[in-house]
Amino acid sequence: MVSTFSRKDQNYKNDDLNQPSKEGRFGKYGGQYVPETLMPALFELETAASNAWKDKLFVEELNHLLKTYVGRETPLYEAKRLTEHYKTKQATPRIWLKREDLNHTGAHKINNALGQALLAIRMGKKRIIAETGAGQHGVATATVCARFGLKCIIYMGAEDIKRQSLNVFRMKLLGAEVKVVNSGTATLKDATSEAIRDWVSNVETTHYILGSVAGPHPFPKIVRDFHAVIGEETKKQCLESFGSFPDILLACVGGGSNAMGLFHPFVKETSVRLIGVEAAGSGVDTDKHAATITKGSVGILHGSMSLLLQDDNGQVQEAHSISAGLDYPGVGPEHSHLKEIGRAEYGSVTDQEALDALKLVSELEGIIPALETSHAFAWLDKLCPTLEKDTHIVINCSGRGDKDVNTVASSLDI
């Protein structure tokens, strides 16, 4: 589905970009729709995070581990053959990749997992739970738990376990207990629901490392802030590489953490277009897609008000994507807000378009992107023909595709 965004669609004030509010709202989205038993834990987490960012020693430890353990900063790489491929008579899109796939564990997810593990230790919590879809957040969480000697339980849908058997083994090898979720569609939504149930029952001893910019306040802000290192590095690297900020930022969106990490430091730089790409699955006009912003309506899921895929009765519908990490019927509340005020644009691409993009990037650049990331690459087919001048485009290469090889092998005729 091609975006119809134009500059005149922007109708925000500066206050709209200073989010969330004290009540945890991004405009009308966000909030805390949770049982009373969780409210003290959410308040404790909000206070711990606020105090931690003011603590020089905490920030120094986080930055030291991001450098020596995660491997930051990640490179900004110019994809010259991809640039040549998308060159038109009107314009040359210079395409740059923010290489989050080169992080320890192979994706952006460890930025947040590491930060939240340090918060858990600060709060005296020894037991960690997390949900995972593609397995990357599960692997990242299991990794930091191994590093700090924390007990780790990962909830994962049975369907995703079939798709991501390699990551399941990695989590177990790292010492985590992987709990299979068979309820509902047995995918990310259901794994998240089970993790929240666990947290309600064990809130005194347990910290829930939520993996996306979704869930009740303060999670959307906390996850965003730990991932904002992506965009902060990108700002500096763009100035070093070509002397200005990029014209366009491009990222895939499921729950939306990798996109928010890239977008957030640029939100007030209103000359920079922010484009998120959702999973259209078999097509947005079918019932097999995960294009929440494109086709969703306002509702409440997992403690937050946001755009959701739901029927006329408000029942959450099944999402579908070949990518386990995008197979989610909701989206982070800040994305819903940025869409509503016109600051960000969102489109969607199908499973087949993502597969074709994965193959193209692999052949042209020698980089096998994750299926999630491939959705962002696929948007270049729609975006580049519309460009009227030479344009710097930064794509968040959010993860590597090793985990997806079996899925891709059964889908592509190579």
Curated annotation (Swiss-Prot):
Its EC number is 4.2.1.20. Pfam families: PALP (PF00291). CDD domains: Trp-synth_B. The modification N6-(pyridoxal phosphate)lysine is found at residue 109. Keywords: Amino-acid biosynthesis, Aromatic amino acid biosynthesis, Lyase, Pyridoxal phosphate, Tryptophan biosynthesis. GO terms for molecular function: tryptophan synthase activity. GO terms for cellular component: cytoplasm. The keyword Lyase applies. It catalyses: (1S,2R)-1-C-(indol-3-yl)glycerol 3-phosphate + L-serine = D-glyceraldehyde 3-phosphate + L-tryptophan + H2O. InterPro entries: Trp_synth_b_CS, Trp_synth_beta, Trp_synth_beta/beta-like, TrpB-like_PALP, TrpB-like_PALP_sf. Pathway: Amino-acid biosynthesis; L-tryptophan biosynthesis; L-tryptophan from chorismate: step 5/5. Residues 1-27 are annotated as: Disordered. Residues 1-26 have a biased composition (Basic and acidic residues). Its cofactor is pyridoxal 5'-phosphate. The beta subunit is responsible for the synthesis of L-tryptophan from indole and L-serine. Belongs to the TrpB family. Tetramer of two alpha and two beta chains. NCBIfam families: trpB. This is Tryptophan synthase beta chain. The gene is trpB.
